[in-house]
Regions:
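Helix-biased detector of long, well-ordered alpha-helical tracts
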Residues: 1-352
Length: 352
């Protein structure tokens, strides 16, 4: 079994959300998908026009469906852990919108040469995480593929009047990040055996942790905007929030939580290609303080798998929200910045 575990991450070219389409390539594809104004369904409350985390479709005045799908290649050598992380990552999009997950459909690509016991462990990990979220597996789909892939399509519910989008940040708000960054660097390092499974444990725990607590607490207190940090990295998803909200974000580089060993690995150029793709696409919208070195700069573009929530909340409620999250969560959230006015003297993202 140990040999099989170590093979798992060797069976694909990329790891997790680092294997997503680059932002440039995705933009080229999506520009051809145009929905004419007269064809828009008024019940589709949230679509893909602002790069939000999930789609939201109104069913009645007090209920809407939240729908999302996410799957990817292995981010851990242990099949069960991979299943947990993949499910947590998919569920996160519903949590980011302030929704409650209800049902899930498994999506699995698998080669019969690997062994059915490995797939069974992956599905078990996913099932346990979905159960932890209070959702139910309703079915799934499998297909033969040389690369192992697993993920989940999730359906949740939300009150239409309480949808939290990535485009509601307000000037004066405080920014809270609920998980440390660096998972892309660490999964890459594990894949090429720069680090051991023991050194990967922090990243494994962070990625397998549901964003349930952060979501529940932000719904209780009321927030302006939220998104989860995944394949486009902290800067990419922060930019989507800023652009969608028509504001600028000022982020303190010293406040951003980063997992252990990440910067040392980046110094050795051990990071996924997705970090460079993110940098290429988003750098024109970012201003960096001169004090920030290249290692730190690249780390902020690192594509995350099952990353934390980036929450924009009124400054008068920020400390209370932070305390409420941290009282319940082993992984500590941090205040990392604030929302400011976008003007001719700044850019949408300003790292100080």
């Amino acid at each position: 079994m140990e040999t099989q575990k170590k093979k798992l991450m060797q069976l694909s070219a990329r790891c997790g959300c680092a294997g997503k389409f680059t932002p440039d390539d995705l933009a080229k594809v999506l520009k051809h998908i145009e929905v004419k104004e007269e064809e828009r369904d008024p019940n589709l409350l949230v679509g893909f026009d602002k790069s939000d985390d999930a789609g939201v479709y109104k069913i009645s005045d007090d209920m809407a469906l939240v729908q999302t799908v996410d799957f990817f290649t292995p981010v851990a050598n242990d099949p069960y852990t991979f299943g947990q992380i993949a499910a947590a990552n998919a569920l996160s999009d519903v949590y980011a919108m302030g929704g409650k997950p209800l049902t899930a459909l498994n999506l699995s690509c698998f080669s019969a040469t690997i062994g059915a016991d490995i797939l069974a462990e992956i599905l078990k990990g996913g099932a346990d995480k979905i159960r932890e979220a209070g959702a139910t597996i309703a079915g799934g789909h499998t297909i033969t593929d040389e690369e192992v892939k697993y993920g989940v399509s999730v359906t949740g519910i939300i009150n239409p009047s309480r949808i939290i989008t990535n485009s509601g940040a307000k000037v004066g708000d405080v920014l809270i990040l609920t998980k440390p960054i660096g998972s892309g660097v660490l999964t890459t390092a594990l894949k090429i055996e720069f680090i051991t499974d023991e050194e990967f444990e922090e990243a494994s725990k962070v990625m397998a942790t549901l964003n349930k607590i952060g979501s529940e607490e932000m719904q209780k207190i009321g927030v302006s905007s939220c998104t989860d940090i995944t394949g486009f990295g902290l800067i990419g998803h922060a930019y989507e929030m800023a652009a969608g909200s028509g504001v600028a974000l000022e982020i303190d580089s010293n406040k951003i939580p980063i997992m252990n060993k990440v910067k040392d690995l980046v110094k050795e150029y051990c990071l996924p290609s997705g970090a460079y793709s993110n940098e290429k696409h988003f750098e024109k919208w970012v201003s960096f303080s001169e004090k920030i070195d290249d290692v730190t700069r690249l780390t902020f573009f690192d594509p995350q798998t099952s990353g934390g929530l980036l929450i924009s909340v009124n400054k008068d409620r920020a400390d209370e929200l932070l305390k409420n999250i941290n009282d319940r969560s082993e992984i500590k959230a941090e205040i990392i910045g604030r929302v400011v006015e976008l003007n001719e003297n700044n850019k949408p993202i300003n790292i100080i």
